[in-house]
């Protein structure tokens, strides 16, 4: 929708995190990060829901044109109105599509209803009375392979040399597709070169968990990766991803020399600190005094600093 057609004075501002709290995804990012844009939140209302329900049979999702099972974790607005009939409102997040654009994306308002119905129900929302749709919402239905017909390398068992990723494999989501694409592309290249292919066990990564779930369990609806799917989630953390996966990437030719040198430097710092903690002994009296000064329950006795870090 067009930014200038929205009355932001009727919406709730959703500011981003302070710059000081921003954390990059990659250990390689060292450039300063800034939150330059704000998001907003609007809410549907009973009139919005009435318009949607009055036209529900015009939705391909409910009129029989689309028969596939939709995504479980990001349902359309008509799905939410039907499934959660007891709720008198649903949130819609208004997100800028970029730093220098007038396009705003309505997160939580995906729909397959015709454009005239979309215009009607969007304009029933406070702050959206004069909204202009730049590109209407739409629904798609796509086929996928049975993921149990894939090897753990993401190669098809039926068509050798064919590797799949993303929606083709029955998943939903950008990160899920990107991760599978990395693995499938790597293995396709190594297969072409006659080299050993990479299989990631469940305990190594969320990608390993995702692939194992796909090829052993299959899917009934578009698969999304969540921490709750992994029995190893306490050890699969973003702060140790570098240590878990960079050596594997190096072994399989994905990590260049400069990145490997930075990784080794970081590991040497960590190892030096581990040695320092292992060699540091704290007397009981000194430890109790320090903990009491910090407002913590005093330790029963002193010991090696490395072991004291395990204290809950």
Residues of each region from the PLM?
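Internal hydrophobic alpha-helix adjacent to the cofactor/substrate pocket in enzyme cavities
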Residues: 177-200
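Glycine-rich loop(s) and the adjacent beta-strand/alpha-helix scaffold that form part
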Residues: 1-5, 125-126, 130, 183-191
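Glycine-rich phosphate/pyrophosphate-binding beta-alpha loops
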Residues: 167-175, 231-233
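Rossmann-like dinucleotide-binding core of oxidoreductases
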Residues: 1-94, 98-99
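A glycine-rich dinucleotide-binding beta-alpha-beta segment and adjacent secondary-structure elements
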Residues: 105-169, 199-212
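Extended, charge-enriched "interface" segments that sit outside catalytic cores
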Residues: 229, 241, 246-312
């Amino acid at each position: 929708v067009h930014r200038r057609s929205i009355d932001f004075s009727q919406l709730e501002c959703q500011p981003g995190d302070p710059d000081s709290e921003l954390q990059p995804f990659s250990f390689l990012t060292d450039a300063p990060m800034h939150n330059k844009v704000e998001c907003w939140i609007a809410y549907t209302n009973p009139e919005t829901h009435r318009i949607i329900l009055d036209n529900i049979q015009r939705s391909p999702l409910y009129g029989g044109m689309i028969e596939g099972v939709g995504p479980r974790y990001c349902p359309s607005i008509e799905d939410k109105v039907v499934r959660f009939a007891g709720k008198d409102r649903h949130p819609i997040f208004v997100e800028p599509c970029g730093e220098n654009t007038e396009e705003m994306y309505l997160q939580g308002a995906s729909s397959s209803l015709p454009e005239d119905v979309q215009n009607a129900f969007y304009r029933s929302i406070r702050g959206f009375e004069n909204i202009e749709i730049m590109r209407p919402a739409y629904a798609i239905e796509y086929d996928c392979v049975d993921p149990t017909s894939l090897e753990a390398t993401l190669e098809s068992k039926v068509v050798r040399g064919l590797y799949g990723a993303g929606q083709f494999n029955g998943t939903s989501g950008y990160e899920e597709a990107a991760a599978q694409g990395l693995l499938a592309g790597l293995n396709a290249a190594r297969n072409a070169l006659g080299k050993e292919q990479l299989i990631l066990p469940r305990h190594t990564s969320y990608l390993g968990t995702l692939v194992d779930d796909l090829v052993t369990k299959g899917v009934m609806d578009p698969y999304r990766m969540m921490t709750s799917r992994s029995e190893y989630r306490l050890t699969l953390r973003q702060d140790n991803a570098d240590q878990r996966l960079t050596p594997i990437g190096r072994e399989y030719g994905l990590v260049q020399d400069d990145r490997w040198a930075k990784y080794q430097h970081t590991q040497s710092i960590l190892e030096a600190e581990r040695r320092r903690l292992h060699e540091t002994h704290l007397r009981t009296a000194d430890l109790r005094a320090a903990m009491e000064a910090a407002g913590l329950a005093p330790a029963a006795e002193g010991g090696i600093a490395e072991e004291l870090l395990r204290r809950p």
